[in-house]
Structures are given as structure tokens and as C-alpha cells.
Amino acid sequence: MTELDTIANPSDPAVQRIIDVTKPSRSNIKTTLIEDVEPLMHSIAAGVEFIEVYGSDSSPFPSELLDLCGRQNIPVRLIDSSIVNQLFKGERKAKTFGIARVPRPARFGDIASRRGDVVVLDGVKIVGNIGAIVRTSLALGASGIILVDSDITSIADRRLQRASRGYVFSLPVVLSGREEAIAFIRDSGMQLMTLKADGDISVKELGDNPDRLALLFGSEKGGPSDLFEEASSASVSIPMMSQTESLNVSVSLGIALHERIDRNLAANR
């Protein structure tokens, strides 16, 4: 295995770079910290540009990650575990992490150039749910996600990277206002289908529609906003036992996209 250099001096510029990138109050985010083997590998595979990848000297550096970094010419160094403990004081301490340049924000044009359905999240704020939705949307052939009123200001949000296991860089995730999202959907000629408890049609009927759709999911508490409701072509419900009030939004999305799987996989071929 390749012998890796170890950073043992807290004054090393790389240490200061990590300190800077983990500050919560940064306003202009150009670099981000990505943690753990799986998110690192998924981010690298998605084309994210890394400045350097690090590992704690208290654990063996994963060979598969080292090989991938080598193929992509990404520098790799170890950091003394005492410095790692200081860097992530009070936080969960990752064994592997890297500093990457934040990709440019996704635009509606990035979604328009693809052919799968579009996922719209209206007022969904729990980052764990959004991360799960990113992974499911990618797996089931959606062309992108539009986040409205999510309280997320950048896809470089470390919580979102963790929750999505790094897949947030693998498909377009557009941060948008409601009016802009509705205009894009209309201009693209898509029907807006709103998922809600008392929908007009069953989710099973989604699979029969050959057209590209925009699937709207509101927050679990408030549901979709009035503006999106007015713009919807139809509302869709998921049949369930009467004693169950609602499903988690990421579960609802998985059910809806699975009904669309044949259409979306064909569109992505």
C-alpha cells in the first residue's frame, strides 16, 4: 500500500483550510467538507473537484478510496489523530474526509436537458428526508429535484451531503421560489401532479401516463401550498389503512416514483 504523508503540525495550511470550511457562519461558500468513504466516492464519481482528501492516522486509509483518488489525481494525506480530535471537537469525528470545490448551483436548464420526471418539494425542511429523496430520485430515474422553501441555502450543506450519502452532486438539485418553479413546469409542458391524502386519482394510475410529469410533495404537516395546488393538473393519493394518517414524505416519493419506473428507466436509456 502507498505510504502516505502525515500532517503532524497544527499550523499546516491544510488544517487551517479545514477549520475555515467548517465555520457555520460562512456567507460565500466556495469550498465544502465531505465526510466518510461512501459520500467521498460518490462525490468523486459525480465529478466534484477535490483539493485534497484526508484520513486520520488512527485508522487504515480505505484502499478503494485511495485507488479512486489516485486515478483522479487527488492528493491524499493522513492527519495526526490528536489534530483530528481538535478539528471536530464536539462533533462526530469522521475517519476520512476531503475538501472540495462547490459545484456551480444547478439551474432549471440542467433539469430540462434530461428526460425523467421532476420531483418538486414544497416546504420540506427535514434534511434527512431530503437526503433520502435525493437517493431515491436518482435510483428511480428522476431527472432532478426542485427545492422550494426548504431552508437549505446551498447543496454544499454538510447535513444534506451526509443524508444523501454524497449523491446530491449526482443529479440537478435546484433551489427555487414557487413562482419560478411553476413557470418552469408550465414552460416545459409538464403536468404537475400533487401527492396528497385525498387525491383525485390513485398513485397506481401514474404508471399509465407516458408523459413526463412533475411530482409535487408538500410538507407532512402543512401539505402543498395554495400556489402549487392552483397550478396542479391533478391530485394523487396513496391508498393506505384508515388508521394511518400519513406516510413519511420520502416513503411517499418512493412509492410514486416506483409506479413511474418503467417510463423513467426507458427515458434514461
Swiss-Prot record:
Keywords: Antibiotic resistance, Methyltransferase, S-adenosyl-L-methionine, Transferase. Belongs to the class IV-like SAM-binding methyltransferase superfamily. RNA methyltransferase TsnR/AvirB family. Specifically methylates the adenosine-1067 in 23S ribosomal RNA. Confers resistance to antibiotic thiostrepton. It comes from Streptomyces azureus. Gene3D superfamilies: 3.30.1330.30, 3.40.1280.10. GO terms for biological process: response to antibiotic. NCBIfam families: NshR_TsnR. CDD domains: SpoU-like_NHR (cd18108). It catalyses: adenosine(1067) in 23S rRNA + S-adenosyl-L-methionine = 2'-O-methyladenosine(1067) in 23S rRNA + S-adenosyl-L-homocysteine + H(+). This is 23S rRNA (adenosine(1067)-2'-O)-methyltransferase. It is an enzyme of class 2 (transferase). S-adenosyl-L-methionine binds at R135, R165, L195, G218, I238, L247. Its EC number is 2.1.1.230. One of its GO terms (molecular function) is 23S rRNA (adenosine(1067)-2'-O)-methyltransferase activity. The keyword NADP does not apply. Optimum pH is 7.5-7.6. PANTHER family: RRNA METHYLTRANSFERASE 3, RRNA METHYLTRANSFERASE 3, MITOCHONDRIAL. It comes from the Bacteria.
